[in-house]
Amino acid sequence: MFLLRILITGGLGFVGSHLIDSLVKKHHKIRIITKSLSKINNIKKSKKQVQIEKINIINFNKLGKSIEQFRPDVIIHLAGNTSHSKSFENPIMDVESNCKSTLFILEKIRELPYPCKFILGSTFIVVGRPKKLPINEKTPCNPTTIYGTNRLASEYFCKIYNQVYGLDTRIFRITNSYGPREQIVSNKNAVNFL
């Protein structure tokens, strides 16, 4: 018997794949939404215990049908653009993958006839350049990139849907994560420092 039905967007990525490995051990029923199977080896230990559906998160029709069919108790939204440079090269795509996808999922949850928790994977980049260090959750946000601005907008959507509609929304800001399965990106600070 499964404990929770958990739908994870971006479940084959660095953070998502480690989360999948942990959740599978706890016997949750998991569905991964991914736009590409290129990182399938990230979950080689767990892939027989999860459902994988190839859907681009900006295909809202297919994403909505998958949510309705799976009937999740929890949606963990980790998918989206994570590149600052790509957000400047194609800002419209960044809005689609980071901002509109979050809003679509929240709206879909609002329409469901049962409660569903929403967890947003955000980033410390929403803070921008802080006036003092160290930063904490109360540090004012002043993003300096398109990516950071879209992620902050997604956080605000979560807060609004919680306050106005009573949705159970949570936000966690991922900060300089690194480790096995990480995609090597030339301008990522933590990896370059190490």
Annotated model-derived regions:
Residues 9, 33, 75-79, 118-124, ...:
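SDR active-site strand-loop-helix element
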Residues 6-26:
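N-terminal Rossmann NAD(P)H-binding glycine-rich loop of SDR-like oxidoreductase domains
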Residues 47-59:
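Rossmann-fold cofactor-recognition segment
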Residues 146, 150-153:
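Active-site helix of classical SDR
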Residues 77, 103-146:
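Conserved Rossmann-fold NAD(P)-dependent oxidoreductase catalytic core, especially the SDR/UDP-sugar
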Residues 28-38:
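Conserved glycine-rich Rossmann-like NAD(P)H-binding loop of the short-chain dehydrogenase/reductase
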Residues 132-133, 156-194:
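NAD(P)-dependent short-chain dehydrogenase/reductase
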Residues 57-97:
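NAD(P)H-binding glycine-rich loop region in Rossmannoid oxidoreductase-like domains
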